[in-house]
Amino acid sequence: MTRSSKASPGVFVALLRGVNVGGNNMISMSSLKQSFEGVGFTDVTTYINSGNIIFTTKENDARKLELKVEQMLSKEYGLGSKVVVRSLAEMEKLVKSLPPHWDSDSNWRYNVMFLRHTIDSEKVLADLPFNSDVEQVVYRPGTLLWSAQLSDINRTNMQKLSSKKIFQDMTVRNLNTTKKLCELMKKAAKT
């Protein structure tokens, strides 16, 4: 449901794909902050150097927000990559739904794959090349929760995933970053 323009502002996070990864698509976070403010977003903050931007806006339609951010990135930086936008409510729901054992074992890596609305379905699992012998993948609305033991990382199919066309409609954050983003969004909502 889309709120009218008279709605109270909401807190969102934009998760950019492929920014500042492997020396590609280098953009300073201070420049991104200014660009987000330039298109009308307020209370803009960034977290780490990999394209996590928290902002406030009266627009409540994530698809419209994704489009607005993508257009700005294309115009100002020449980037054609897709963006995933999540509301504070969606991030809180995600963090609450994480398996209880996640983050309890430092011998495992835990990642959250954020899905764009175009592929947000449990059926997406059938299209992805996961190695069930070493990777655990669970669907949650809007995300795939991926985990593997560190000793098996080289046996996972994570690298194969990045070459799939469907990968263009998702972006990955590790568990710590995901939790921190939710925490920062809650803090932004209180100010």
State what each model feature region is.
Residues R3-S50, I54-T191:
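Surface-exposed, charge/polar-rich loops and edge strands
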